[in-house]
Amino acid sequence: MPDTNFTHPMRKWEDILTIVSGKNQKNVETDNGQYPIYGSGGIIGRANAFLCEAGTTIVGRKGTINSPIYVNERFWNVDTAFGIVPGPELLPKFLYYFCRHFNFKDLDKSTTIPSLAKRDLLAIKMVVPSLPEQERIVARIEELFSELDKAVETLNTTKQQLAVYRQAVLTFHLTPKDNWRICKASEIGEVCLGRQRSPQNVAKDYPTKYIRAANITEDGLDLSD
Protein backbone atom coordinates (compact mmCIF):
# COMPACT_ATOMS: atom_id res chain seq x y z
CA MET A 1 0.00 0.00 0.00
CA PRO A 2 1.35 3.50 -0.79
CA ASP A 3 2.28 5.61 2.19
CA THR A 4 -0.72 7.95 2.65
CA ASN A 5 0.89 9.99 5.41
CA PHE A 6 1.74 13.29 3.75
CA THR A 7 2.91 14.92 7.00
CA HIS A 8 6.40 13.47 7.05
CA PRO A 9 8.68 15.77 9.07
CA MET A 10 11.52 17.57 7.37
CA ARG A 11 14.85 16.01 8.29
CA LYS A 12 18.27 17.61 8.11
CA TRP A 13 20.94 15.81 6.15
CA GLU A 14 23.21 15.76 9.19
CA ASP A 15 20.71 13.41 10.87
CA ILE A 16 20.10 10.96 8.03
CA LEU A 17 23.29 10.66 5.97
CA THR A 18 27.07 10.98 5.95
CA ILE A 19 29.20 13.17 3.71
CA VAL A 20 32.59 11.76 2.72
CA SER A 21 35.04 14.48 1.73
CA GLY A 22 37.28 13.60 -1.19
CA LYS A 23 41.04 13.23 -0.97
CA ASN A 24 44.00 13.63 -3.28
CA GLN A 25 44.44 10.51 -5.38
CA LYS A 26 48.22 10.74 -5.77
CA ASN A 27 49.07 7.78 -3.52
CA VAL A 28 46.33 5.42 -4.74
CA GLU A 29 46.12 6.11 -8.46
CA THR A 30 47.18 3.31 -10.80
CA ASP A 31 46.32 2.46 -14.39
CA ASN A 32 44.90 -0.95 -13.52
CA GLY A 33 43.22 0.01 -10.25
CA GLN A 34 40.16 -1.91 -9.11
CA TYR A 35 38.17 1.21 -8.24
CA PRO A 36 37.22 4.26 -10.32
CA ILE A 37 38.37 7.71 -9.26
CA TYR A 38 35.63 10.32 -9.47
CA GLY A 39 35.83 14.08 -9.71
CA SER A 40 32.79 16.34 -9.78
CA GLY A 41 32.32 15.68 -13.49
CA GLY A 42 32.83 11.91 -13.63
CA ILE A 43 35.57 9.28 -13.76
CA ILE A 44 39.11 10.64 -14.03
CA GLY A 45 41.22 7.54 -13.32
CA ARG A 46 41.59 4.26 -11.42
CA ALA A 47 42.70 3.56 -7.85
CA ASN A 48 43.76 0.60 -5.69
CA ALA A 49 41.72 1.88 -2.72
CA PHE A 50 38.26 3.34 -2.15
CA LEU A 51 36.59 5.94 0.08
CA CYS A 52 32.90 5.38 -0.66
CA GLU A 53 30.72 2.31 -0.83
CA ALA A 54 28.43 1.41 -3.73
CA GLY A 55 25.15 3.32 -3.71
CA THR A 56 26.77 6.65 -2.96
CA THR A 57 25.79 9.85 -4.76
CA ILE A 58 28.51 12.27 -5.83
CA VAL A 59 27.87 15.99 -5.49
CA GLY A 60 30.56 18.36 -6.69
CA ARG A 61 32.34 20.43 -4.05
CA LYS A 62 33.94 22.72 -6.61
CA GLY A 63 33.28 23.27 -10.30
CA THR A 64 30.38 21.07 -11.42
CA ILE A 65 28.14 21.37 -8.35
CA ASN A 66 24.68 20.77 -9.81
CA SER A 67 25.07 17.46 -11.67
CA PRO A 68 24.84 14.61 -9.12
CA ILE A 69 26.23 11.22 -10.13
CA TYR A 70 24.98 7.88 -8.79
CA VAL A 71 27.73 5.26 -8.42
CA ASN A 72 26.82 1.60 -8.02
CA GLU A 73 30.33 0.43 -7.08
CA ARG A 74 33.00 1.36 -4.56
CA PHE A 75 35.08 4.37 -5.61
CA TRP A 76 37.62 7.01 -4.61
CA ASN A 77 36.48 10.63 -4.75
CA VAL A 78 38.96 13.47 -5.14
CA ASP A 79 38.83 16.72 -3.20
CA THR A 80 36.51 18.40 -5.70
CA ALA A 81 33.71 15.90 -5.01
CA PHE A 82 31.64 14.96 -1.98
CA GLY A 83 30.34 11.42 -1.46
CA ILE A 84 26.77 11.56 -0.11
CA VAL A 85 26.21 8.28 1.76
CA PRO A 86 22.62 7.43 2.78
CA GLY A 87 21.87 6.31 6.32
CA PRO A 88 19.49 3.45 7.22
CA GLU A 89 16.41 5.66 6.74
CA LEU A 90 17.20 6.39 3.09
CA LEU A 91 17.27 4.26 -0.03
CA PRO A 92 20.36 5.15 -2.12
CA LYS A 93 18.35 5.84 -5.28
CA PHE A 94 15.77 7.93 -3.40
CA LEU A 95 18.58 10.14 -2.10
CA TYR A 96 20.07 10.33 -5.59
CA TYR A 97 16.82 11.47 -7.18
CA PHE A 98 16.37 14.04 -4.43
CA CYS A 99 19.84 15.36 -5.30
CA ARG A 100 18.84 15.49 -8.97
CA HIS A 101 15.83 17.56 -7.97
CA PHE A 102 17.63 19.87 -5.52
CA ASN A 103 19.23 23.06 -6.85
CA PHE A 104 22.69 23.09 -5.28
CA LYS A 105 23.43 26.42 -6.95
CA ASP A 106 21.31 28.00 -4.22
CA LEU A 107 24.08 27.09 -1.75
CA ASP A 108 26.91 28.51 -3.84
CA LYS A 109 28.45 31.50 -2.07
CA SER A 110 31.57 31.78 -4.22
CA THR A 111 32.34 34.70 -6.50
CA THR A 112 34.45 32.79 -9.03
CA ILE A 113 34.37 28.98 -9.34
CA PRO A 114 31.08 27.43 -8.11
CA SER A 115 31.69 25.85 -4.69
CA LEU A 116 29.78 24.11 -1.90
CA ALA A 117 30.56 23.90 1.81
CA LYS A 118 30.00 20.70 3.77
CA ARG A 119 28.23 22.56 6.58
CA ASP A 120 25.70 23.97 4.11
CA LEU A 121 25.00 20.53 2.68
CA LEU A 122 24.45 19.04 6.14
CA ALA A 123 21.83 21.74 6.79
CA ILE A 124 19.71 20.70 3.78
CA LYS A 125 16.25 19.51 4.77
CA MET A 126 14.26 16.83 3.00
CA VAL A 127 11.13 14.76 3.54
CA VAL A 128 11.85 11.13 4.42
CA PRO A 129 8.92 8.79 3.65
CA SER A 130 8.89 5.19 4.83
CA LEU A 131 11.27 2.83 3.03
CA PRO A 132 8.42 1.06 1.16
CA GLU A 133 7.15 4.44 -0.05
CA GLN A 134 10.66 5.45 -1.12
CA GLU A 135 10.91 2.21 -3.07
CA ARG A 136 7.57 2.90 -4.77
CA ILE A 137 8.63 6.46 -5.67
CA VAL A 138 11.97 5.32 -7.10
CA ALA A 139 10.27 2.60 -9.16
CA ARG A 140 7.80 5.10 -10.60
CA ILE A 141 10.51 7.65 -11.42
CA GLU A 142 12.59 5.04 -13.22
CA GLU A 143 9.54 3.75 -15.09
CA LEU A 144 8.75 7.25 -16.37
CA PHE A 145 12.40 7.97 -17.19
CA SER A 146 12.53 4.73 -19.20
CA GLU A 147 9.49 5.83 -21.19
CA LEU A 148 11.08 9.23 -21.82
CA ASP A 149 14.32 7.60 -23.00
CA LYS A 150 12.35 5.45 -25.45
CA ALA A 151 10.49 8.51 -26.70
CA VAL A 152 13.76 10.39 -27.25
CA GLU A 153 15.21 7.39 -29.09
CA THR A 154 12.13 7.20 -31.33
CA LEU A 155 12.31 10.94 -32.00
CA ASN A 156 16.00 10.76 -32.93
CA THR A 157 15.33 7.82 -35.26
CA THR A 158 12.48 9.73 -36.90
CA LYS A 159 14.68 12.81 -37.37
CA GLN A 160 17.37 10.68 -39.02
CA GLN A 161 14.80 9.10 -41.32
CA LEU A 162 13.43 12.52 -42.25
CA ALA A 163 16.93 13.77 -43.04
CA VAL A 164 17.51 10.79 -45.34
CA TYR A 165 14.13 11.33 -47.00
CA ARG A 166 14.78 15.06 -47.46
CA GLN A 167 18.11 14.34 -49.12
CA ALA A 168 16.49 11.71 -51.36
CA VAL A 169 13.85 14.23 -52.45
CA LEU A 170 16.51 16.81 -53.29
CA THR A 171 18.65 14.27 -55.13
CA PHE A 172 15.70 13.02 -57.20
CA HIS A 173 14.45 16.44 -58.21
CA LEU A 174 17.79 18.23 -58.66
CA THR A 175 19.84 15.57 -60.44
CA PRO A 176 20.34 16.90 -64.00
CA LYS A 177 17.99 15.41 -66.58
CA ASP A 178 18.73 14.88 -70.28
CA ASN A 179 16.71 17.94 -71.30
CA TRP A 180 18.29 20.26 -68.70
CA ARG A 181 20.78 22.94 -69.62
CA ILE A 182 23.92 23.22 -67.49
CA CYS A 183 25.04 26.81 -67.00
CA LYS A 184 26.92 29.09 -64.64
CA ALA A 185 25.16 30.93 -61.83
CA SER A 186 26.29 34.22 -63.37
CA GLU A 187 24.31 33.41 -66.52
CA ILE A 188 20.97 33.20 -64.74
CA GLY A 189 21.35 35.53 -61.77
CA GLU A 190 23.52 37.90 -59.81
CA VAL A 191 25.85 36.95 -56.95
CA CYS A 192 26.19 39.70 -54.34
CA LEU A 193 28.82 39.82 -51.64
CA GLY A 194 27.66 40.57 -48.11
CA ARG A 195 28.75 43.56 -46.07
CA GLN A 196 29.17 44.31 -42.41
CA ARG A 197 26.21 45.84 -40.62
CA SER A 198 26.11 49.60 -40.84
CA PRO A 199 25.44 51.34 -37.49
CA GLN A 200 23.07 53.75 -39.21
CA ASN A 201 20.91 50.87 -40.46
CA VAL A 202 20.82 49.20 -37.05
CA ALA A 203 19.89 52.35 -35.14
CA LYS A 204 17.02 53.61 -37.29
CA ASP A 205 13.34 53.00 -36.45
CA TYR A 206 12.92 50.20 -38.99
CA PRO A 207 16.31 48.43 -39.16
CA THR A 208 17.35 46.79 -42.40
CA LYS A 209 17.17 43.00 -42.16
CA TYR A 210 20.60 41.47 -41.72
CA ILE A 211 21.14 37.84 -42.70
CA ARG A 212 24.17 35.87 -41.54
CA ALA A 213 25.31 32.37 -42.43
CA ALA A 214 23.82 31.19 -39.13
CA ASN A 215 20.35 32.27 -40.32
CA ILE A 216 20.47 29.90 -43.28
CA THR A 217 19.24 26.41 -42.36
CA GLU A 218 18.08 23.30 -44.18
CA ASP A 219 14.51 24.39 -43.48
CA GLY A 220 14.97 27.89 -44.90
CA LEU A 221 15.73 31.22 -43.28
CA ASP A 222 15.63 31.38 -39.49
CA LEU A 223 15.19 35.04 -38.55
CA SER A 224 14.61 34.49 -34.83
CA ASP A 225 18.06 35.91 -34.06
What are these regions (language model features)?
Residues 1-24, 28-39, 123-138, 146, ...:
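Non-catalytic DNA-recognition/assembly elements of restriction-modification systems
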Residues 11-54, 71-72, 76-79, 186-200, ...:
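Sequence-specific dsDNA recognition surfaces
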Residues 39-101, 109-121, 194, 212-213:
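A short beta-sheet element
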Residues 146-152:
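Short arginine-rich
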Residues 205:
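N-terminal basic, Ser/Thr-rich segments that initiate or prime the first beta/alpha elements at protein or domain
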